[in-house]
């Protein structure tokens, strides 16, 4: 308990809500207590949209986006999960810029405040400038996100405290696992702004879908069209497995269903 109180005395490093979530998590073993949201409530229609996206495969989502928009909206092979997981949610974006050797105690406070403004069905999307060997997040931030009901996090940069994040079951995709810190090396550069994460443009409110195949980003104005097409693709592909086994021919199955 003393280490939490000492940590809390550092000016603005963590909010009361975040500290409460951390203390509750440790007091009750690994149980994460959900904090009251300060973000606008997710509508029932939006919640249902996210539920439906959780049920489709990222491969189908990626194909559907490309057919509808003509754009590649999937992240590269470097974006890897810390454990096998599947999630979807609305992008909550944060950007960090390099500021080597800064002694400003407020340099990263905006990053923490941005976390405390998220809620259920949020996906934390962070772009860390040249950040493959810098941990953009770790166990404390992951605990706060879990307490607030975030679906997961996608970090164009490193992640640390991986054993703890696995223990609490909070899913994170990142481009590396490293023990480093962003403190004194980086500065908060904005939240809820358009950014590029692992080569993919992401705007606040876009839908981020992740599974064992990787991460795809659905532009919010194309969400319903992409979902409908991805559902059709999933149905065809799942139907094809039995046909291929029965006929022992992928050529015949592709000809029948028109899906590859």
What are the residue ranges of the model-derived segments?
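Bacterial N-terminal signal peptides that target proteins for export
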Residues: 3-18
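Bacterial N-terminal signal peptides
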Residues: 16-27
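Signal peptide processing junction and immediate N-terminal pro/mature segment
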Residues: 27-37
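Intrinsically disordered, low-complexity regions enriched in acidic/Ser/Thr/Pro/Gln residues
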Residues: 36-106, 236, 242-250, 255-256
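General beta-strand structural signal in soluble alpha/beta enzymes
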Residues: 73-76, 95, 125-127, 153-157, ...
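Extracellular/luminal Protease-associated
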Residues: 114-157
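Ligand/cofactor pocket segment of small-molecule handling proteins
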Residues: 143-147, 151-180
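Acidic, glycine-rich flexible loop/linker segments
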Residues: 177-253
